[in-house]
Structure formats: structure tokens, C-alpha cells
């Protein structure tokens, strides 16, 4: 099982959809070699070097955390059922209320729409908040996502810059 990496007072919690099989087998988030999460958060400015999946706990040193909408591992996120995403959305709200990070970044538009019963959303900062926590939707860094790495970095950097502007 892939455990959450959470603590009070984080700048951001990145929320994936669910663990892939590589993550389920290793116990580390975003563990598949084709997943660009670790590269993207480094290039966007969240970490001072590119961490490896097995160093995930070090995210806390950078005031970042990770969680997921659904615990059940799958080969592809499309295998996750709607009821799992809706339940995951409710559970995620509780986690965010408990830990109160400055921002929540949900990684994937469809996951956000289904988990939070929203439709037709755009990338970036959302008008909704969970308490004082800003909610962002960023592209999923999965290797199955065709978006170019440069575009991922640009989207994630926008969040990093917004946090810096708030003194975080």
C-alpha cells in the first residue's frame, strides 16, 4: 500500500488519482519510471533537486505532501470507478480540513470533476476552497498523459509562484 505523506503546515499537497502497479509494488508514490512527477515538481521549483520515489518522505522537508483520491491500485486510472472517486473526494476534503495545507493540487481534470462533482473545469486555481486551502487542478504527470513535460512544468510552476506571492 502507498501511504500518504502529510503533515500540518505544508505549502501544498499533491493529490494523485490512485496508485499504479509500480507504486503498489514498491510502496512509493509516483514510482513508475515513466511518471514525470518527481522531475516536474523539481523543475517547477518545489524541490531543490529531483527526488526519487523511494525518497518520498523527503517531500516534507520542502513542505510538500502527497495523497490520492483512491487507494486501490490499477494499471490505468481509467479503471477507477465513479463511486470510488466520489468517496475519495469526500475523504480528501476531510484530510485537507485536518492538515490545512496552503494549497491542494489535484492531478487530473477528470479526477477532479468526478471526485468533486464538477463539470467543465479548466486547469489552474479554482474558485472553491477547503477552509483556507486553495484548490488547484494540474495536469497528471503520468507517462500515459500526452501533455509535454514543458507544459506540465509551466502549470506546476504557476502554483509554486502563487504560493511564493503569498509568502509561502
UniProtKB/Swiss-Prot annotation:
Its EC number is 3.2.2.28. It holds the Pfam family UDG. It is found in: Cytoplasm. Keywords: Cytoplasm, DNA damage, DNA excision, DNA repair, DNA-binding, Hydrolase. One of its GO terms (cellular component) is cytoplasm. It is an enzyme of class 3 (hydrolase). It catalyses: Specifically hydrolyzes mismatched double-stranded DNA and polynucleotides, releasing free uracil. InterPro entries: MUG/TDG, MUG_bact, Uracil-DNA_glycosylase-like, Uracil-DNA_glycosylase-like_sf. Gene3D superfamilies: Uracil-DNA glycosylase-like domain. The keyword Ribonucleoprotein does not apply. GO terms for biological process: base-excision repair, AP site formation. One of its GO terms (molecular function) is uracil DNA N-glycosylase activity. SUPFAM superfamilies: Uracil-DNA glycosylase-like. It comes from the Bacteria. PANTHER family: G/T AND G/U MISMATCH-SPECIFIC DNA GLYCOSYLASE, G_T MISMATCH-SPECIFIC THYMINE DNA GLYCOSYLASE. Excises ethenocytosine and uracil, which can arise by alkylation or deamination of cytosine, respectively, from the corresponding mispairs with guanine in ds-DNA. It is capable of hydrolyzing the carbon-nitrogen bond between the sugar-phosphate backbone of the DNA and the mispaired base. The complementary strand guanine functions in substrate recognition. Required for DNA damage lesion repair in stationary-phase cells. Belongs to the uracil-DNA glycosylase (UDG) superfamily. TDG/mug family. Binds DNA as a monomer. This is G/U mismatch-specific DNA glycosylase. It comes from Salmonella gallinarum (strain 287/91 / NCTC 13346).
